[in-house]
Structure formats: structure tokens, C-alpha cells
Amino acid sequence: MQISIIEARDLSEAWFLCLSKTLSDGYDYHIERGSYKGQRRKQLDFFVCHIKYPGTRPLIPDVPQGVPAPSTMEYVENYLPYLMTAHRAEGEQYTYGQYLETQITEVIRMYKADGHNTNQAYMTVGEPKAIFLTDPPCLRGIDTRIKDNKLDFYIYFRSWDLWAGFPSNLAGIQLLKEYMASEIGVDDGEMVVMSKGLHIYEYCWDLAKIVVNR
């Protein structure tokens, strides 16, 4: 197993460095079950990325002219209710918010009422029966810690689309972190993100190469 460790300044740099690492070190993965079954992707064995200043704007990466943007802030703002509230649109099997909404409130309460030094402020996504869904949640947990009066997040994805998912996911989670920090009364902190399934689908390989080599 090859563990890839990436140090990044902000969300944009994290995305660019992860694209480069996945293109160079990712192995050929033929999908036998799940999204895009029968197709290929490049995937890292396991990766950990430490993002020092995830709140740096813009939260969404800039791409070369002619390359479709992986996300927009308008999309991220529309994504926030999916991340933070239990409301489900018609046809949705789940939202992250249905699992996180009450936990967000409890983590804020916990830190304010009981103090900052606890390892119990962990937010879980999913439940045992989620394994039977057609597409189980990719985000599985957000751990939190307050150190030096800053709220840090530790985020795990079981599978993670680097092109179409990573920028929107982390921009939305960063906005969630800023909201929680404000409610708790501390400063916004750092991020550590990890996955054993960070990947780029074959249809994005050429686009990713343009971005990395610009």
C-alpha cells in the first residue's frame, strides 16, 4: 500500500496537488460495482492532505480558459442545505444533512457547555442499513477539535471524485466549519482530509492534464 501525504496552503492548491498526485501515482482501477460501473479511473491507495488555510478565498479553484469549472460558488451555496439540513428533494435517497443536522447542533452545544478539551465531538454520516443503498454516502465522518482557540476538521471519504466532488465538498464543508466556529466563539482552523478512494474518472483525465500542465 502506498500512502500519499500532501501539504497544501488552501483548498485550491490542495485540488491541484491532488490532481497531479493522482495522475502520476494513481493505479488503473476498473469499476466492478458503483458509479460508472464498467469504466476506468485512476485512484490512490490512500491519501492524507493537510490544508493549512482552508478559509482562503476563493474557495473554488480557478481553471485554464476552455476547461469547464469543476464547481462554482453558486453551486456550493445551493449544496449547503444538502450538507447541513435534513430536507430531502424528491428522488434523493439521502442527504448528508439528514445525518449531520442534529450532530452539528450537539457539537456546538458540547463545546460551549463543557469546554474545548474533548475527543467526543465526532459527527457520523450514514447508518448500518446505508450499505444497501444503490449509492451509499461517500462522506462518512467529520471529526473536530479545538486547539489554540481554532476549530479544526478531520474529514474522511470512503470514495471521492476528485474532479466533480472534491472542490464542492470541501468548499461546503469549509463554510460549515466557519459557521460552527462562529457559533462556538472560536476562530476558524485547519483541515485534514483523507480517503482510500480518491479518484479521477477516465472522462476527466485529459482535462486534469490540462489543469496540471498549464
Residue ranges and their predicted role:
Residues 1-214:
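Terminal, non-catalytic protein-protein interaction segments that mediate quaternary/complex assembly
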